[in-house]
């Protein structure tokens, strides 16, 4: 879900920073609405709408019986769209933080806007956005526990089943909390390691 969400985020960010006019302005409004919607509503509600609500959305000729998704597909779609909305703002802010002089230098070398974005701007924006993107990934790992609400079998769902069988909910939930804490601690360490590598690369490149 995070990889799909990042792809959505990059596309959304690039569309929103585009200065093209005409019909493209309508597309920008649509993507702005998408970001606003998913950033302004709870993730759990989004899961319920996609899994429980879409079956009631009957579209003549396309989905006359509603859009029915299995739990895993509904979870992937929801988490991806939610991640895309949040990360798009991170990437957009990172791109806009790059000084205009970088664009001008790229143009002076004969680069097109697309080539300048790919070779000059995005690599720098990636370094700037790495910490918040890593935090978004860690948050996503913790948010996967919400998938149990639509019957996706994940760690929290399994712990609920075991707790119901042995009548030891406190032990099971504490164990799940510990596992999440260990996983997030490891991810936080990896985040710091990647930040050191990228910082070292920038220092040596200068």
What are these regions, as identified by a protein language model?
Residues 1-206:
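Transmembrane alpha-helices and adjacent helix-loop boundaries
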